[in-house]
Curated annotation (Swiss-Prot):
Belongs to the CRISPR-associated endoribonuclease Cas2 protein family. This is CRISPR-associated endoribonuclease Cas2 3. It comes from Synechocystis sp. (strain ATCC 27184 / PCC 6803 / Kazusa). Homodimer, forms a heterotetramer with a Cas1 homodimer. CRISPR (clustered regularly interspaced short palindromic repeat), is an adaptive immune system that provides protection against mobile genetic elements (viruses, transposable elements and conjugative plasmids). CRISPR clusters contain sequences complementary to antecedent mobile elements and target invading nucleic acids. CRISPR clusters are transcribed and processed into CRISPR RNA (crRNA). Functions as a ssRNA-specific endoribonuclease. Involved in the integration of spacer DNA into the CRISPR cassette. Mg(2+) binds at residue 9. HAMAP family: Cas2 (MF_01471).
Length: 92
């Protein structure tokens, strides 16, 4: 399992809503266009496949950032919500 930060910039309101609705089924919205999703490799691949059906390469931008255990210890958060913790992880 990895914690993925997924960020997007989609100018079309309808596509942006579809993207957000899909991502809400996989993780937690932490900012307007940013989600944290704890996913297995197979779930991540499934999500990407579903996102590709919405994504328009000539207009949209999608970014996927996998966070390692070491990286998670370096995260600094100001405000809410708190960092999504992968199952079985300990953040020091």
């Amino acid at each position: 399992m990895f914690l993925y930060v997924i960020a997007y910039d989609i100018p079309d309101d309808r596509r942006r809503k579809k993207m957000a609705d899909l991502l809400e089924g996989y993780g937690q919205r932490v900012q307007y266009s940013v989600f944290e999703c704890t996913l297995s490799k197979s779930k991540f691949n499934e999500l990407q496949k579903r996102l590709r059906k919405i994504y328009q390469s000539e207009e949209d931008s999608l970014r996927f950032y996998p966070l390692s255990g070491h990286t998670l210890t370096q995260v600094d958060i100001w405000g809410e919500p708190p960092l999504t913790k992968p199952p079985g992880s300990v953040i020091v």
